[in-house]
Swiss-Prot record:
<keyword id="KW-0548">Nucleotidyltransferase</keyword>
<feature type="region of interest" description="Disordered">
    <location>
        <begin position="774"/>
        <end position="834"/>
    </location>
</feature>
<comment type="subunit">
    <text>Interacts with replication protein 1a.</text>
</comment>
<dbReference type="GO" id="GO:0003723">
    <property type="term" value="F:RNA binding"/>
</dbReference>
<comment type="similarity">
    <text>Belongs to the ssRNA positive-strand viruses RNA-directed RNA polymerase family.</text>
</comment>
<feature type="compositionally biased region" description="Basic and acidic residues">
    <location>
        <begin position="806"/>
        <end position="817"/>
    </location>
</feature>
<dbReference type="Pfam" id="PF00978">
    <property type="entry name" value="RdRP_2"/>
</dbReference>
<keyword id="KW-0696">RNA-directed RNA polymerase</keyword>
<protein>
    <recommendedName>
        <fullName>RNA-directed RNA polymerase 2a</fullName>
        <ecNumber>2.7.7.48</ecNumber>
    </recommendedName>
</protein>
<dbReference type="GO" id="GO:0000166">
    <property type="term" value="F:nucleotide binding"/>
</dbReference>
<dbReference type="GO" id="GO:0003968">
    <property type="term" value="F:RNA-directed RNA polymerase activity"/>
</dbReference>
<dbReference type="InterPro" id="IPR047309">
    <property type="entry name" value="Bromoviridae_RdRp"/>
</dbReference>
<keyword id="KW-0693">Viral RNA replication</keyword>
<dbReference type="InterPro" id="IPR007094">
    <property type="entry name" value="RNA-dir_pol_PSvirus"/>
</dbReference>
<dbReference type="InterPro" id="IPR043502">
    <property type="entry name" value="DNA/RNA_pol_sf"/>
</dbReference>
<dbReference type="GO" id="GO:0006351">
    <property type="term" value="P:DNA-templated transcription"/>
</dbReference>
<dbReference type="GO" id="GO:0039690">
    <property type="term" value="P:positive stranded viral RNA replication"/>
</dbReference>
Length: 834
């Protein structure tokens, strides 16, 4: 190796090996190799043969006295060939562990011992290359095994100076992005050569911001005063409530607005949009579909199905609902009759697909949970955020339901309840269908499988606390849009000019099996859920029994997602994220969004992954949407001119919601309709941010997703802006039969007053029918002179209804024209003509 000198530097020979140096290096290697006769021997310290005679072989001669290092004639293969007793003896001789009671320190590990011996052999064979002296062989193996210093002497300070009189040498800046490899702080070796430490595990995980950096713990306050409550809680629960506050600086918002053409919007124009966008929906009428279902024959191939014939419901009253003016293909409320429940169970719970092959459940579940942690969590934030606000959430939950009469005494004993028994029902609301298939297919309602309220109220606080910790530990590029501290609104992030990945997982709930349940258990333990509770929760999800008491239908199920328990949304989100991290390298994405079974990711580079693993390994019917669009949770993601991203509800689905048939008709009570109006206004809070730039994006994404013309988006947005202005305009979209009947029946009251226009006595004026006006519930007579008011009251024996109006008018015409009353009519029979 060429040494540094001024002569070699000026001659240009620095860094080049001369022939003399090459010959010297070869001679040195030849002398060193002469001490090693075979490939099975390596030099070692001389005290190895004395301390470890079991490692010497009789067929290998001892080294000469001139050789400073002796040879050890065993290989890694020798250790692998040893029995457990022999390898244990080698471990005790080399590592020399200590015993604290029954605990061995360090703990014996055969693979680690073999690796330490192999590294020690390699270090001794290259001992001349190190400036410091290595330890003896046995101590060297023990140091590598324990992760201690492998050198025997203290570090040597470099005294050699590279300074040359008259010359100044500056370090060369490497423009190719060269970065020094990480060195182990204990042994000084390069990270990938160090066998005693995992540098990747010790690396600081502050590369990405998390929600815990933005939200700090604001206060801790005691909230529980009930001693009985505290006595029934576990030791891991703390009777305090934590509050978080946002600490990042608030940025001034600039909303670029534009006028919306609300003056040209009408019900007819919105109906024209429906006719164009939803051609099969405008003729859809499901008024008698329930009758067709109940009167037709029904066959099912579900095994282990139990029907209770005494509970069969042939027909159920659908109730009174407001009639929408728009025809958007919205379905009527579904009734949980026996045949409707059987149809829903066959589609939602039965016919479970079996697409995956045989896998090692334990190994795969642990590996997927490990990948989940590495892909999404900031490990330091996870370690620091070890507080679970279970008691505070439980107290808030009980206060929320205190108005309904729920108290702590009403909570059942979970150990005395059969947690494998679930109640079942069908959803009365059917999700709007955007495909043009309503003319040939009737949508099947979704099902809900749930525990009783008392059981859910005891599990919900724990899972809410785990979800809060889960959100606080997520990396900054992972978004779960739920709760108060996360949403789809993303500042300083644009969805434009990026590759998009949108995975559609169909039959998500019933396709989950034992592998998905074990993955959830591993992740729950990772988040700090007590192991006994997570195991208990997963045990009664392995085999369950669902029962629809109203329809008299019951059947057993196993593993699949319970769609109405305390862990439904959280569990579905965890499963989606875990499957996504296993099939795709999450480091290639700039932003990832997950919500239930929906997922969306953005990348600057073309996306690479194994989407077929969703089916072959995880038993999921996955569809990679092509072309992918920034669409999640039935919302489009748009970016404004300032580079901020916000969400816009799907215009097609919002248009369908305007024609819903499931708003109860309260007559004069408009509370139900007003609640729908407030929800409609809340969903349209994005309207002030819509500009020509964002509307153009919405049209493009709309056309990409639905393969339909986006020209109707302008009319839809104008309609949304008009009908979200005030409640009076919104009421034009619905017709109330109860309100019509109430207005008609209001004219059949007992008190009627007949007002006549003034008649001049000097002139004979011909009376006509327009001179008589009827008013109901008039309490004050006009005081204008020249008016005659006749007070009349119908007999209480007369019939009420529309015919009563005619009889009252006839009776009023028979009253005296000369009698004038300045006060409301008194009760009693009407006065007779004199």
């Amino acid at each position: 190796m060429a040494t540094f000198s001024l002569e070699s530097l000026l001659s240009g020979a620095y860094g080049v090996d001369t022939p003399e140096e090459v010959a010297f290096i070869r001679e040195r290697d030849r002398v060193f190799a002469s001490g090693v006769d075979t490939a099975e021997s390596v030099p070692c310290s001389p005290d190895v043969s004395e301390s470890d005679p079991c490692f010497e072989h009789d067929d290998i001669p001892s080294t000469s006295a001139t050789c400073p290092l002796e040879r050890v004639s065993f290989l890694v293969e020798d250790l692998n060939a040893m029995s457990d007793v022999e390898i244990k003896t080698v471990f005790e001789n080399l590592i020399r562990p200590t015993y604290v009671g029954c605990i061995e320190v360090p703990e014996f590990c055969r693979n680690k011992l073999t690796l330490s011996v192999s590294v020690a052999r390699n270090l001794i064979s290259t001992a001349s290359r190190y400036p410091r002296k290595l330890k003896a062989y046995s101590d060297l193996v023990a140091s590598i095994y324990n992760g201690a210093d492998i050198f025997d002497d203290a570090p040597v300070d470099e005294t050699v100076s590279d300074e040359v009189p008259g010359y100044i040498f500056l370090p060369v800046e490497r423009p190719d992005g060269y970065e020094r490899p990480p060195l182990c702080s204990d042994c000084g070796l390069i990270g990938y050569q160090c066998a005693c430490h995992d540098l990747a595990g010790r690396r600081a995980a502050f590369a990405e911001m998390t929600i815990s950096h933005t939200y700090e713990l604001e206060s801790l306050s005691g909230v529980i005063d009930d001693a009985t409550l505290l006595a029934n809680l576990g030791s891991f629960l703390l009777p305090i409530h934590c509050e978080y506050s946002r600490v990042d600086p608030s940025l001034s918002s600039f909303h670029l607005t534009q006028p919306h053409p609300t003056d040209r919007v009408s019900v007819e124009s919105l109906q024209a949009v429906c006719d164009t966008s939803l051609p099969t929906h405008v003729c859809y009428d499901d008024t008698y579909h329930q009758v067709f279902v109940e009167n037709s024959d029904f066959t099912t191939d579900i095994d282990h199905l139990t029907l209770k014939q005494s509970d069969l419901i042939p027909k159920a009253d659908g109730g009174n609902y407001l009639k929408p003016v728009l025809t958007t293909g919205s379905g009527s409320k579904r009734l949980g009759t026996t045949k409707e429940v059987l149809t829903a169970i066959k589609k939602r719970n039965a016919d479970v697909p079996e697409l995956s092959g045989s896998v090692d459940l334990t190994r795969i579940s642990k590996a997927v949970a490990r990948r989940f942690k590495e892909s999404y969590f900031n490990t330091n934030a996870l370690a620091q955020s070890n507080f679970l606000n279970v008691v505070g959430n439980f107290h808030a939950y009980m206060q929320k339901w205190a108005a309904s009469g729920l108290t702590y005494d009403d909570l059942p004993d979970l150990h005395a309840e059969n947690l494998q028994l679930y109640e079942h029902m069908v959803k009365s609301d059917v999700k709007p269908v955007v495909a043009d298939t309503l003319n040939v297919d009737r949508p099947v309602p979704a099902t809900i499988t749930f525990h009783a309220k008392g059981i859910t109220s005891q599990f919900s606080p724990l899972f809410i606390s785990l979800f809060e910790r889960f959100q606080r530990c997520l990396r900054g590029r992972v978004v779960v849009p739920v709760g108060k501290i996360s949403s789809l609104e993303m500042d300083n992030f644009s969805v434009l000019n990026k590759h998009c990945l949108e995975i559609d997982l169909s039959k998500f709930d019933k396709s989950q099996g034992e592998l998905h349940l074990m993955i959830q258990e591993e992740i729950l333990n990772l988040l700090g859920c007590p192991v006994d509770i997570s195991k208990w929760w997963c045990d009664f999800h392995r085999y369950s029994y669902i029962k629809d008491k109203r329809a008299g239908v019951s059947m057993p199920i196993s593993f699949q997602r319970r769609t109405g328990d305390a862990f439904t949304y959280f569990g579905n989100t965890l499963v989606t994220m875990a499957l996504f991290s296993w099939c795709y390298d999450t480091d290639q994405f700039d932003r990832m969004l997950f919500s239930g079974d929906d997922s969306l990711a953005f990348s600057l580079n073309p996306i690479e992954g194994k989407s077929d693993w969703f089916t072959s390994l995880f038993n999921m019917e996955a569809k990679n949407m092509d072309p992918p669009t920034p669409y999640i949770c039935s919302k489009f993601l748009l970016t404004d001119e300032l580079g901020n991203t916000f969400s816009v509800p799907d215009p097609l689905r919002e248009l369908q919601r305007l024609g819903t048939k499931k708003i109860p008709d309260g007559g004069l009570d408009e509370s139900y309709l007003k609640a729908h109006f407030m929800s409609f206004v809340d969903r349209l809070k994005f309207l002030p941010r819509m500009t020509h730039h964002t509307v153009a994006q919405l049209i493009t994404f709309y056309e990409m997703k639905y393969k339909k013309s986006g020209a109707e988006c302008h009319a839809s947005l104008g309609g949304f802006a008009k009908y979200s202005t005030n409640f009076s305009i919104y009421k034009e979209l619905y017709i109330s039969d109860q309100k019509r009947l109430s207005l008609i029946n209001s004219y059949s009251d007992d008190n009627f007053e007949v007002e006549r226009k003034p008649i001049l006595k000097s002139k004979k004026v011909k009376r006509n029918r327009k001179d008589v006006e009827c008013r109901a519930n008039s309490y004050e007579a006009p005081k204008t002179s020249g008016k005659a008011e006749v007070s009349a009251q119908t007999s209480p024996t007369k019939q009420e209804g529309p015919w009563a109006q005619k009889s009252e008018r006839v009776e009023a015409s028979r009253t005296s024209r000369d009698s004038v009353s300045l006060f409301p009519a008194s009760t009693g029979p009407p006065p007779r003509r004199r």
